[in-house]
């Protein structure tokens, strides 16, 4: 795997699924291919994106700044600086300085990533902030190692919380989670339907699922009533795709 492919993989792993993720993936591809040279426009676009956490925006802003050539005098952006200040915790800043000194001695992406993984997310963010604010310099490879270590830690904590959701036994939470997943799947079906001849059929299935979820939420139902709702929806989607001649590998 090439360095930029690895960076793209790690960065995208912390972004929630949806149309925005696809848009960000395209921006990263363009930036890494040298097709987008307007850093200021890119940062303005990033600043106004909804859904993303400040830290995620900070990491993306850091990656864009590392990759897109810019004039030396270009101002640093406040929204990135605020996101990469380690929550203003002096302990994070102390650890970030120690980490920075170690990173100065590293020359490879993997070496930097290994060193960085032993630090907390707050310290890693603060260290990115040091480099972003030009208070310290490391090679681009080492900076990318720092980025990927940070993303790995964030993705780990997200994965733990997803696992907890999967093992949760509270029927009310499981019921709501199934309905949320059904709504999300319905939305994906509508987006995939596009303008094909059978699109109306897919839209109809998705619409019915939405209405069912809405009705369940409005009148209140037994927590078991949503069991199988998302699976039924996925079966409908797979049947629709087979007729379209599209083989769906994995959609769960």
Swiss-Prot record:
List localization entries.
Virion membrane; Host nucleus
Q: How does it sit in the membrane?
A: Peripheral membrane protein
One GO CC term, this protein: virion membrane
Signal peptide extent: none
Domain of life, source organism = Viruses
Which residues lie within the region annotated Membrane-binding? Answer: 1-164
Keywords (alphabetical) are: Host nucleus, Membrane, RNA-binding, Viral matrix protein, Virion
Membrane spanning segments where? none
| GO terms of molecular function | RNA binding; structural constituent of virion
**RNP-binding: region residues:** 165-252
Q: What biological process terms from GO does the record include?
A: viral budding from plasma membrane
Where does this chain carry the motif Nuclear localization signal?
101-105
Pfam families the record matches: Flu_M1, Flu_M1_C
InterPro entries given in the database record: Flu_matrix_M1, Flu_matrix_M1_C, Flu_matrix_M1_N, Flu_matrix_M1_N_sub1, Flu_matrix_M1_N_sub2, INFV_M1
Q: Which family does it belong to?
A: Belongs to the influenza viruses Matrix protein M1 family.
What is annotated about its quaternary structure and interactions?
Answer: Homodimer and homomultimer. Interacts with NEP. Binds ribonucleocapsid by both interacting with genomic RNA and NP protein. May interact with HA and NA. Cannot bind NP without genomic RNA.
Give the note: Most abundant protein in virion. When expressed alone can form virus-like particles in transfected cells.
Functional note: Plays critical roles in virus replication, from virus entry and uncoating to assembly and budding of the virus particle. M1 binding to ribonucleocapsids (RNPs) in nucleus seems to inhibit viral transcription. Interaction of viral NEP with M1-RNP is thought to promote nuclear export of the complex, which is targeted to the virion assembly site at the apical plasma membrane in polarized epithelial cells. Interactions with NA and HA may bring M1, a non-raft-associated protein, into lipid rafts. Forms a continuous shell on the inner side of the lipid bilayer in virion, where it binds the RNP.
What protein name does the entry list? Answer: Matrix protein 1
The organism of origin for this protein: Influenza A virus (strain A/Chicken/Shantou/4231/2003 H5N1 genotype V)
The gene from which this protein is expressed is M
């Amino acid at each position: 795997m090439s360095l930029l492919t690895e960076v793209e993989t790690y960065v995208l792993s912390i972004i929630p699924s949806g149309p925005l993720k696809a848009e960000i993936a395209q921006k990263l591809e363009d930036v890494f291919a040298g097709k987008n040279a307007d850093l200021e426009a890119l940062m303005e676009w990033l600043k106004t994106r909804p859904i993303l956490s400040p830290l995620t925006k900070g990491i993306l802003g850091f990656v864009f700044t590392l990759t897109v050539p810019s004039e030396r005098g270009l101002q640093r952006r406040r929204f990135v600086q605020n996101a990469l200040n380690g929550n203003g915790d002096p302990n994070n800043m102390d650890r970030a300085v120690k980490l920075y000194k170690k990173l100065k001695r590293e020359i490879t992406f993997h070496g930097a990533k290994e060193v960085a993984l032993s630090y907390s997310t707050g310290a890693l963010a603060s260290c990115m902030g040091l480099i972003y604010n030009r208070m310290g310099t490391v090679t681009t490879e080492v900076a990318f190692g720092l980025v990927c270590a940070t993303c790995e830690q964030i993705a780990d904590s997200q994965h733990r919380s997803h696992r907890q959701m999967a093992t949760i036994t509270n029927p009310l939470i499981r019921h709501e989670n199934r309905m949320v997943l059904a709504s999300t799947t319905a939305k994906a079906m509508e987006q995939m339907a596009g303008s094909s001849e059978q699109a109306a059929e897919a839209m109809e299935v998705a619409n019915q699922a939405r209405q069912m979820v809405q009705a369940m939420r409005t009148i209140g139902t037994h927590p078991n009533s949503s069991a199988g709702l998302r699976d039924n929806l996925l079966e409908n989607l797979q049947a629709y795709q087979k007729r379209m001649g599209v083989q769906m590998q994995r959609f769960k």
